[in-house]
């Protein structure tokens, strides 16, 4: 009897969560295909929050080759999500906290990092450039037909 009640309560909780799940109850706009490709969401649209908090991350690593006078550079790109920020002072204007995927973060190499994280890697080198970007010009992504380009 106790096992039957536990099973019933488990199934009831799963059913309740399924019904109350926000992803299942929010309807997206009819123009979802066009929205994802060609539009920046307006402030009234559901996905504007995601757009405002998402940034393009780019960084370049300098790799010393076995030849003394030869240096290679490798570029990495990924997506970052702003999770917090901190107002700074006269020496440090502000600080941002970005979340990203492990495969993106693994490429960031800084010699001044905490020792376990600053081990040299012959394939990645050291990061010499970091870029934070945001696309705001929708016309760059509109299909040629909409731009009347033939």
Curated annotation (Swiss-Prot):
Keyword Membrane: yes
InterPro entries in alphabetical order: Mycoplasma_peptidase_DUF31, Uncharacterised_MG067
Alphabetical UniProt keywords: Cell membrane, Lipoprotein, Membrane, Palmitate, Signal
Membrane topology of the entry: Lipid-anchor
Subcellular location: Cell membrane
Lipidation feature positions (N-palmitoyl cysteine): 23
Position of the signal peptide: 1-22
Residues in coiled coil: none
Lipidation (S-diacylglycerol cysteine): 23
A GO CC annotation given for this chain: plasma membrane
Pfam families assigned to the protein according to its UniProt record, in alphabetical order: Mycop_pep_DUF31 (PF01732)
Highest taxon of the lineage: Bacteria
Family: Belongs to the MG067/MG068/MG395 family.
Protein name according to UniProt: Uncharacterized lipoprotein MPN_587
Source organism: Mycoplasma pneumoniae (strain ATCC 29342 / M129 / Subtype 1) (Mycoplasmoides pneumoniae)
Lineage: Bacteria, Bacillati, Mycoplasmatota, Mycoplasmoidales, Mycoplasmoidaceae
